[in-house]
């Protein structure tokens, strides 16, 4: 466990890995420790799991995974972006063999899919299935980009397989198209054979309507 093991990075390095796939790294300090620990080992490839959340407030779509001007909005995204930049710098300066994979909103077995409210509250699906009216925040133009967990795994596998082309690069792991909250909601009404009943509320009123501060 990375949080419980003070020497987590050192213990990984002691295994003399050829490839490290780092899925549980959420802080720049942990990235720095891992790079330092793996220096001088037989490592041939380090794959870092970032997130499209590192993009933050996008100015254009589709976003460029290799952008150096991302504007993350919270600590999670900020730390992912800082780790991306750190790994890119280590690759350029020292040849550290890093690749960055940026998954979207992951779905599939073991995952509760992100819903048209942008959270994991299944209540919205129940409302839609009953043909009830739902409300979306603002104008429902916020964007989600889903991906199946299996496809995320394939991105890591393909990056390992095509190592030379992947080194020093960032890649999105997302579906072919993104969805607005509004478009997603309409698709769900159609899936349940119900007439779309979609309204809109400003952010504060929508938060009251949704009712769970932790999810908003």
What residue ranges belong to the model's regions?
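Conserved beta-loop-beta element that borders a ligand/cofactor-binding pocket
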Residues: 85-115
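NAD(P)-cofactor binding segment of oxidoreductase domains
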Residues: 13-62, 67, 78-90
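Structural signature of the Rossmann-like NAD(P)-dependent dehydrogenase/reductase core
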Residues: 46-48, 99-105, 145, 172
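A conserved pocket-lining segment of Rossmann-fold NAD(P)-dependent short-chain dehydrogenase/reductase
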Residues: 124-147
């Amino acid at each position: 466990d990375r949080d419980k093991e003070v020497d987590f990075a050192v213990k990984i390095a002691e295994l003399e890995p050829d490839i490290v796939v780092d899925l549980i790294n959420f802080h720049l300090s942990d990235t720095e420790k891992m790079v330092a620990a793996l220096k001088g080992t037989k490592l041939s490839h380090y794959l870092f799991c970032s997130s499209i959340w590192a993009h933050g407030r996008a100015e254009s779509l589709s976003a460029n995974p290799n952008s150096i001007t991302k504007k993350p909005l919270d600590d999670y995204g900020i730390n992912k972006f800082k780790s991306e930049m750190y790994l890119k710098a280590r690759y350029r300066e020292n040849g550290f063999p890093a690749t960055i994979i940026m998954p979207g909103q992951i779905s599939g077995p073991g995952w509760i899919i992100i819903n048209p409210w942008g959270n994991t509250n299944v209540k919205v699906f129940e409302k839609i299935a009953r043909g009830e009216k739902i409300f979306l925040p603002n104008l429902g133009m916020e964007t989600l980009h889903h991906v199946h967990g299996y496809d995320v795994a394939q991105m890591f596998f393909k990056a390992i397989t095509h190592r030379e082309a992947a080194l020093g690069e960032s890649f999105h792991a997302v579906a072919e198209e993104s969805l607005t909250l509004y478009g997603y909601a309409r698709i769900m009404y159609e899936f349940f054979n119900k007439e779309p009943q979609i309204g809109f509320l400003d952010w504060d009123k929508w938060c009251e309507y949704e009712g769970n501060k932790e999810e908003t």
